[in-house]
Structure formats: structure tokens, C-alpha cells
UniProtKB/Swiss-Prot annotation:
High-level lineage: Bacteria, Bacillati, Actinomycetota, Actinomycetes, Micrococcales
Entry keyword annotation includes Nucleotide-binding: no
Name of protein: Exoglucanase A
Catalytic residue list: 188 (proton donor), 410 (nucleophile)
GO molecular function: cellulose 1,4-beta-cellobiosidase activity; polysaccharide binding
Species assigned in the record: Cellulomonas fimi (strain ATCC 484 / DSM 20113 / JCM 1341 / CCUG 24087 / LMG 16345 / NBRC 15513 / NCIMB 8980 / NCTC 7547 / NRS-133)
Database matches in SUPFAM superfamilies: Carbohydrate-binding domain, Fibronectin type III, Glycosyl hydrolases family 6, cellulases
Enzyme class: hydrolase
Domain Fibronectin type-III: 484-569, 579-667, 677-765
Length: 872
């Protein structure tokens, strides 16, 4: 913690005599005696967590204990939950009403009063962890935690007068001056301005983030017993140098904009509400290479050097100091959900020469992607809150804290209407394949409620997967490396290989294997005490070392080096490859015969198989490096004999393979076989006059003329002929049932039997029509559009499609609560899976982000299922 963060002087305030019920059961064991008398003015210390306990939220603890009471079938799990209930967590002020209390919980004064009581019972200083979280345009890149205040001047004014000012006034009350209040300032805000500033919503929010954070720092820093910590994201977000460096610069710019400068910030906090591991014990060296490939280049780490939060906090501390912060600035890590224990946690190194397989097998972080942030399956509770944790000197840690209370949701799995400004983020939908995650499922836990609400299903998993295991059953960590291998010797070399052998190492538990290095590059892993390094260059000198490792991932120092020189590469190869086997002829045409065979091998130390010669009789008709070849230019209705020979790089040729005979087809083949029957015929969302159909493609017989198209039938009437596997039948009557089939036909005119029929009913005509309300908020070249659609008809719409067009070339870039598409100027919004039923008289609200070229005229004509709507 920075000495610059200490106040030059402190105010002495008259403290009112207050009584409060004790909360002994909720307070951890005291660490020291209380440093100051009850009447002393607060002293701003270097590390507020040192020698102090932390506040246990009784409201959250009650939820945890209630969950434990529902685990009567698993007493051990219930006991672990009750242990968790006694741990300190932060109190979140996530909207204005949270200050006085709302349906989601008690107000700030309730918690401060309880903190006073807990400190009195503990007899030592107490840290009250508080989260300031209501910026205008909050969480501009995600949707699940969007807030109540818009990113506008009016929103910023409300943030100051209705949110920060009342909080500061309450914290400045003399009744609470003995509490050390650690305020985490606006999670996700400033990091978004580094990585997501290209998003229109973040561009809109950027000036309000800077001004809002500055205002909060100024107001709270003026209170002597408040300690300001700025959120710095986590290693999987800002760990790359291209993100970390600009972020440190941004934090410094914001600090310098405040009245007190760098002194307004007491520290930084990482991994808030995230699940990035504190440590990756089996991947402790991010510079390690596997088969000459750095492990940080794996798909999971994407060239990021920071594999865990210990790496990241040390990295960020260096950059923050370089940006102007004092070297004593402190760091916090939120360990509430980054334990990653349970049955899927790897406990020993799994060897592999493939870098992705090596990383995936040995990382404790079991997410599909480091960007999977919402209620991730498999996560567990991490280290319990702890002041000044030892062993992490480079990270300059003030404490491990639980900023995100375990059991509180990150966001809803489905779209849940609410008055908190929280929207549905598909990253919280376990059925969503996200392009942000390399087109993988999100891995989110299903059935999640809104962000911040109690999510017991996830809490159960967090407790079960805790690491360290709750209750003291975590195995004692092995920190002792094996002895250094001795006696490393190089045997007789070849032009491309060096055999190595050595004397076995010993370990306090057990040696599990050895890593073999060529220079500084890891070239192999083995459980034996010998290894042959291959793929070397002839007549080249090399130096080799070996390291021993154990199941806990401890690795010894390198052995003494062994030098060896490969032989020259002038060995004459006079041995032919093996004879190709398994030569087979495939389906012929009138002029071609496809051939395939099993690969040949060359002699040990040989020059290697270079390719194959294909013979028709005794004539070479082709060469290839593959194990297949199609002979062309043949005569129809003729029998041929083929064989294959293998050649190596030195020019040695094998004997010919066993011959295979094949006869080309005659040139007058008549196709009389129809294509296969179309399958999978499905009707999509209908309108009042149309039914969209799709089906699976048919196939034609081998040697047939090929599928030419499909005939679509309404009952027994053919209504269309198409070449694709979809068609929309139009001109239908409203509220009418229809039956459709499809037949396939080939070029020769053969027609298949009809597919299985599919039934569909057109939508009823919406007597009364529909009403649309459209609004847009524009900035620079971007805008956000909101559309409210009302069904004025007398019947529910089971599936709906809204259509409209832009007049000025606007483009939809991202949408929500509907499936959005655009073709030219025409925009279509089809219902999402969860809001497809639109009852008579009810409305649905959808929206999108878009771009414009300076003119953003609102659409004036909308249709709902093909019926024109009126503008509201």
C-alpha cells in the first residue's frame, strides 16, 4: 500500500454513543488487539487488512445457512456450507435503492451498524468490503449487469447526487469512523475502455466512466477511514501486454485527474466476480515450450503470458509502478470462486508433444475458453479471505478477499423482465454457441436468475468443487522437487538422432518422469531413464540436459549438460521401400478408374519414401506422393490391369504391387433409378399467407445422372420446382391447415416417391393489427434502436416476424431479444426461442445496436407476420 495514500492530517469528529447487538458468531478469530482507543480519530494505515478481521454479511450468511438446512441428505456438504457462511464477503451497492434497502436486501446503514457490532465483538480492527457499482452506462460490453443510469449528462448528474453523495455522507458519519472501509470502485468499467472501446455503447459511456470514477475517488478519499481499490479485470482479460500496458496508463490518467492524484487510489483488485485461478500449479512456467512450441501459444492461452492471477497481479504491479504509482501500492485478489477443485482437477502432469493437448490436460481452469465468464460450470470456491498472504512477494498482496459472494448469479440464463436495467446476455445461456468463445457453447450453469440474485444450484457446485477443500481434507501440498539427474551420457549418434541415458533421481514422494532439453528447448518427456532425441541435423553439435519432476509438478534443476555431434548426412541409401499393399480399384466411369493402396515404408536410416508410380500393365501412367490415384483417359467397356511401385528419395524403386483388374463402364449407361426420398421435411414459422419449408438433400445412385432438383406439393398439387433444399409456399389462406410433401428428381427425369408429409397452419389474420413504437439514441456514427411491438389482434401469435426498412443505409450490428438479420435496407427480427408467443393485447420489447453515416431517419413502415402495423 502506498505511503502516499496516508492522509497528512485527519479530522477529529464527535462520535455519538451507539449501541449495537453483537455478532460474535459471524466474526473470524482475532488477529491482534485493537490498535486505537474507542475515541481515537481514524488513522489511515498502509494495508487496511493487516491485523484486522473482515465484515461477515448476515443477510448473505442467512442464505447460505438456509441452503445448508436443505442438505439433510448430505450432512458433510451441509457442514461445509455452514463453514462458508462464516466467511466475510463484500456488500454491493448496485443501484440507488440499495443504499436505503430494497427487495433484494438491507441498506448500507444496516450493514455498517452490524460492522460496528462485529468489530466490537472481535476486539480488533474490522475491514468493511464495499462495492461501488452504478456508473452511467454500466458494463457497456456485456448485458447481464447493465445498470439503471444511462450514459448521458443526466445519468452522470444522478450518479453524483443520488448515488455517490448519499453513500459518502453515510460513510462519513462519526459512528463508523473506526471501521476500515475498503471500497472496490466500479468493476469492469475502466478495463472496458481498453479492450472494448470499439463498441458503440462503450464509446458512449467512456467520458462518463472517467468522470464518474474520478468523482467517486474524490468523494471517498476525503473520508479518512475509506480505502479506494480500483478494479483491474483479470489475467484472461487484460493479461496481454497490448492490454495491460494501456490499462496501467489509463489507471494513472484517472488517478492524476483527481484532487489527490495517485494518493486517491489505495490499491487495485483483480478477478472480481471472475473465476480465473489464483495459481496454475502444473503450468507454473508460461515460457515452457513443447516440441519447440511455446505453451502460451495454445488455443486456451492465445499467447498470453499471464496464466493465473498471481502472474497477473505481479505483471500489473510492475506496469502500475512504471506508470507513476508508488512501489508500495497494494493488490487484492477476489478468490471467492476461482478454486477449481473437484474430480476434474488435474493432480499430476500429463505428458504430450501437442501443445494444446498438454495445456488442456494440465490446466486446473476447466472452462472451454478464458472468456467464459457467466456462471461457469465446474468452478469452485477458492482460498478463504486472508490478510497479507505469504509466498507472493512479486504480487504485493494486501489480502485475498471475497468481493463476489459465492452463490450470487452472474446473469440470467434466459430473458427475465426486471426494473433494474439488467438485460439478457447470451453468454449466460448454456445453449448458446458463442463466436467470442471460438464457436463453443458458453459452459454456463442453466436455470440462473438475474445477476446478483441467490443461485443455489451454482452455490452447491461451488462448495463441492472448492479448492482448497473445505473442512481441511485438502492433501498437504508437496513443494519439494526431485534430486537433479546425474550421469547424463550420450550414446552412438546417427545423422539425425542422439540416444541419452542417465541415473534415476529420487523424491520425497515419487519421481514421475523426466523432461529432456536440447539447449533451452523441451524436446521430450519420458518416465524412463533413457531417451533418443530425433529430428536433428547431420554433422551438428548439440547440448542436452535433463530435469526430473514429481506428481505435484515440482521440477528439479537441470542436470550437467552432455554434448554430442550427429554423424554427417552422406550415408548412401541402396535399399528400396517396401512393396505397396492393399491395391484396390473403386467405382469406375466410362473413362476413369480410381485406385488406392496402403503406404510403403523405407528402411531404418533410409532416405524416406518419396512417392509412387502407377502402372497400367507395364506402362507408367502416373506418379503421386499420396496413396490414391485416378487413372484417366481410358476406353469405355474395357478391362485393365493396374499395379503400383514405391520410390524413395535416393531413387530406389520397389517391386510392383499385386495387380488389380478393373473394367470401365460402357458409354451408353441409361439411368433408370430415382434419387432417394427427401427426408427431414420441416415447416418453419408461418405467416397469414405463407409457410417456409426445409428438408435434407436427396442423393442419386452411384453412376447416376445426379439430383437435378425438387418438386414441392401442397396436397396433390405441385406448387414449385426448386434446386435448393428450402422453399416458402405463398398465396395461402389465413388460419388454414395445409399438408406439404417434396419429391426429388434427377437429370434423367427419374422422380422419387414423396417425402413424409408435414402439416402447418397459417397464422390467423390479426384483426386489429399491430402497433409499433420505435426510438433511437444516436451518437457519432452509432445508435441504439428500441422497438416495442404490440399485438392488437384477438388471438395469440405463436411465432412472429417483424419487418421494416432503413432509409439512410443504416446497418444492424448487434441485437437482443430477437434473431436479427438484414438484407440491403430490409431488416427482419424473428422471435427468440423464449418470447415466441405474443398474446392478444400484449407487447414485446426488442432492440439492437447499429451504425449510420450521419443521417439516422427512423423507419416508418413495419409489418408483423406480413400484416402492416401502425406507429404508436
Amino acid at each position: 500500500m502506498s505511503t502516499l495514500g496516508k492522509r497528512a492530517g485527519v479530522r477529529r469528529r464527535v462520535r455519538a454513543v451507539a449501541t449495537a447487538a453483537t455478532a460474535t458468531a459471524l466474526v473470524a478469530v482475532p488477529l491482534t488487539t485493537l490498535a486505537t482507543s474507542a475515541s481515537a480519530a481514524p488513522v489511515h494505515v498502509d494495508n487496511p487488512y493487516a491485523g484486522a478481521v473482515q465484515y461477515v454479511n448476515p443477510t448473505w450468511a442467512a442464505s447460505v445457512n438456509a441452503a445448508a438446512g436443505r442438505q439433510s441428505a448430505d450432512p458433510a456438504l451441509a457442514a461445509k456450507m455452514r463453514t462458508v457462511a462464516g466467511q466475510p464477503t463484500a456488500v454491493w451497492m448496485d443501484r440507488i435503492s440499495a443504499i436505503t434497502g430494497n427487495a433484494d436486501g438491507n441498506g448500507l446503514k444496516f450493514h455498517l451498524d452490524n460492522a460496528v457490532a462485529q468489530q466490537k465483538a472481535a476486539g480488533v480492527p474490522l475491514v468493511f468490503n464495499l462495492v461501488i457499482y452504478d456508473l452511467p452506462g454500466r458494463d457497456c460490453f456485456a448485458l447481464a449487469s447493465n445498470g439503471e443510469l444511462p450514459a448521458t449528462d443526466a445519468g452522470l448528474a444522478r450518479y453524483k447526487s443520488e448515488y455517490i453523495d448519499p453513500i459518502a455522507d453515510l460513510l462519513d458519519n462519526p459512528e463508523y469512523e473506526s471501521i476500515r472501509i475498503a471500497a472496490t470502485i466500479e468493476p469492469d468499467s475502466l478495463p472496458n475502455l481498453t479492450t472494448n472501446i470499439s463498441e458503440p455503447a462503450c464509446q458512449q459511456a467512456a467520458p462518463y466512466y472517467r468522470q464518474g470514477v474520478k468523482y467517486a475517488l474524490d468523494k471517498l478519499h476525503a473520508i479518512p477511514n475509506v480505502y479506494n481499490y480500483i478494479d483491474i479485470g483479470h489475467s484472461g482479460w487484460l493479461g496481454w501486454d497490448s492490454n495491460a500496458g494501456p490499462s496501467a496508463t489509463l489507471f494513472a490518467e484517472v488517478a492524476k485527474s483527481t484532487t489527490a492524484g495517485f494518493a486517491s487510489i489505495d490499491g487495485f483488485v483483480s478477478d472480481v466476480a471472475n473465476t480465473t485461478p489464483l495459481e496454475e500449479p502444473l503450468l507454473s512456467d508460461s515460457s515452457l515450450t513443447i516440441n519447440n512450441t511455446p505453451i502460451r501459444s495454445s488455443k486456451f492461452y492465445e499467447w498470453n503470458f499471464d496464466f493465473d492471477e498471481i502472474d497477473y497481479t505481479a505483471h500489473m504491479h510492475r506496469l502500475l509502478v512504471a506508470a507513476g504509482f508508488p512501489s508500495s501500492i497494494g493488490m487484492l485478489v477476489d478468490t471467492s470462486r476461482n478454486g477449481w477443485g473437484g474430480p476434474n482437477r488435474p493432480t499430476s502432469i500429463t505428458a504430450s508433444t501437442d501443445v494444446n493437448a498438454y495445456v488442456d490436460a494440465n490446466r486446473v481452469d476447466r472452462r472451454v475458453h478464458r472468456g467464459a465468464w457467466c456462471n461457469p460450470l465446474g468452478a469452485g470456491i477458492g482460498r478463504f479471505p486472508e490478510a497479507t498472504p505469504s509466498g507472493y512477494a512479486a504480487s504485493h498482496l494486501d489480502a485475498f478477499v471475497w468481493i463476489k459472494p459465492p452463490g450470487e448469479s452472474d446473469g440470467a440464463s434466459t430473458d427475465i423482465p426486471n426494473d433494474q436495467g439488467k438485460r439478457f446476455d447470451r453468454m449466460c445461456d448454456p445453449t448458446f454457441v458463442s463466436p467470442k468463445l471460438n464457436n463453443q457453447l458458453t459452459g454456463a450453469t442453466p436455470n440462473a436468475p438475474l445477476a446478483g440474485q441467490w443461485f443455489e444450484e451454482q452455490f452447491v457446485t461451488l462448495v463441492k468443487n472448492a479448492y482448497p477443500v473445505i473442512g481441511g481434507t485438502t492433501p498437504v501440498e508437496d513443494l519439494v522437487a526431485p534430486t537433479v539427474p546425474t550421469g547424463l551420457t550420450a550414446g552412438t549418434t546417427t545423422a539425425t538422432s542422439v540416444p541419452l541415458s542417465w541415473t534415476a533421481s529420487t523424491d520425497n514422494v515419487a519421481v514421475t518422469g523426466y523432461d529432456v532439453y536440447r539447449g533451452t528447448t523441451l524436446v521430450g518427456t519420458t518416465a524412463a531413464t533413457s531417451y533418443t532425441v530425433t529430428g536433428l541435423t547431420p554433422a551438428t553439435a548439440y547440448s542436452f540436459t535433463v530435469r526430473a519432476k514429481d506428481a505435484a509438478g515440482n521440477v528439479s534443476a537441470a542436470s550437467a549438460a552432455a554434448a554430442a555431434t550427429t554423424q554427417s548426412g552422406t550415408v548412401t541409401d541402396t535399399t528400396a521401400p517396401s512393396v505397396p499393399a492393399g491395391l484396390t480399384a473403386g467405382t469406375t466411369t466410362t473413362t476413369t478408374v480410381p485406385l488406392s493402396w496402403t503406404a510403403s515404408t523405407d528402411n531404418a536410416g533410409g532416405s524416406g519414401v518419396a512417392g509412387y508410380e502407377v502402372l497400367r500393365g507395364t506402362t507408367v501412367v502416373g506418379t503421386t506422393t499420396a496413396t490414391s490415384y485416378t487413372v484417366t483417359g481410358l476406353t469405355a467397356g474395357t478391362t485393365y490391369s493396374f499395379s503400383v511401385r514405391a520410390k524413395d528419395v535416393a531413387g530406389n524403386t520397389s517391386a510392383a504391387s499385386a495387380a488389380v483388374s478393373a473394367t470401365t463402364q460402357t458409354g451408353t449407361v441409361v439411368d433408370t433409378t430415382a434419387p432417394s426420398v427427401p427426408t427431414g421435411l420441416t415447416a418453419g414459422t408461418t405467416t397469414t399467407s405463407s409457410v417456409p419449408l426445409t428438408w435434407t438433400a436427396s442423393t442419386d445412385n452411384a453412376g447416376g445422372s445426379g439430383v437435378a432438383g425438387y418438386e414441392v406439393f401442397n396436397g396433390t398439387t405441385r406448387v414449385a420446382t426448386v434446386t435448393s433444399t428450402s422453399y416458402t409456399v405463398t398465396g395461402l389462406a389465413a388460419d388454414t391447415a395445409y399438408s406439404f410433401t417434396v419429391k426429388a428428381k434427377d437429370v434423367a427425369g427419374n422422380v422419387s416417391a414423396a417425402s413424409a408429409a408435414v402439416s402447418a397452419r397459417t397464422q390467423a389474420a390479426t384483426s386489429g393489427g399491430c402497433t409499433v413504437k420505435y426510438s433511437a439514441s444516436s451518437w457519432n456514427t452509432g445508435f441504439t434502436g428500441t422497438v416495442e411491438v404490440k399485438n392488437n389482434g384477438t388471438a395469440a401469435l405463436n411465432g412472429w416476424t417483424l419487418g421494416f426498412s432503413f432509409a439512410d443505409g443504416q446497418k444492424v450490428s448487434q441485437g437482443w431479444s430477437a434473431e436479427w438479420s438484414q438484407s440491403g435496407t430490409a431488416v427482419t427480427a424473428k422471435n427468440a426461442p423464449w418470447n415466441g408467443t405474443l398474446a392478444a393485447g400484449s407487447s414485446v420489447s426488442i432492440g439492437f445496436n447499429g451504425t449510420h453515416n450521419g443521417t439516422n431517419t427512423a423507419p416508418t413502415a413495419f409489418t408483423l407476420n406480413g400484416v402492416a402495423c401502425t406507429l404508436g
